[in-house]
Amino acid sequence: MNRFLSLAVILVLILTLAGCGAGTAAPIQPETTPAPSAEPTEEPLESTASAVTSEPVQTGLFAEQIFSGADGDIHYSYYLPDSYDGSRKFPMMVVMPGYNMMWFGEDSSGSNLNWSGFTAWTRLDTEMVVVSAQLTDWGEKSARQAIELTEYFINNFAVDTSRVYAAGYSAGGETMSRAVSMRPDLYAAYLHGASQ
């Protein structure tokens, strides 16, 4: 029953998040551009690193990655849906876990991978890119790193920039609250859970 309730709540949240951008179009889009939907867009990508090539794109879970950012290394994992091939844009969810799943060194590596705040987004019917970082604190440095990681995915993956969402729990909620307040233009909606 608890699992069913959790999945029902997550489904309602994703539908709510999908609807957040439905009435607004990016300023550079023509007025005839259709509103964002819950499905990946069919529009071709502009020149990006993830453009379609003759090589197949690997999908699924990419665990324990490291991105060297301006404020130091960012430990993260991400998920690409099975239909991801770089030819159409997908919504993206950036989720930050709580204190117990932050980066404390090699012993904590990948501790966020079994967290339902990450895995629930990968199991929805709506296909999306899901990113979860293990940051080292919940202050401004981690907020800058969350922004930098979000921008990295926007610039290097087939991401619909009008459907970039964020969620944070506990310490991750502190981090994402700061990130969203620093860059409200970057995130279409934010789900804040169990923190100040």
Question: Where do the protein language model's features map onto the residues?
Answer:
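Active-site catalytic pocket residues across diverse enzymes, especially alpha/beta-hydrolases
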Residues: 157, 183-184
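A domain-start/cap signature at the N-terminus of enzymes
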Residues: 20-90, 167-174, 178-182, 191
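Active-site machinery of serine-nucleophile hydrolases
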Residues: 92, 96-147
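A conserved short beta-strand
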Residues: 185-196
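Sec-dependent N-terminal signal peptides of Gram-positive bacterial secreted proteins and lipoproteins
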Residues: 4-23
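Extracytoplasmic/secreted proteins, especially bacterial periplasmic and envelope-associated proteins
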Residues: 91, 141-152, 174-178, 185-186
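Gly/Ser-rich "nucleophile elbow"/oxyanion-hole loop immediately N-terminal to the catalytic nucleophile
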Residues: 83-84, 138-170
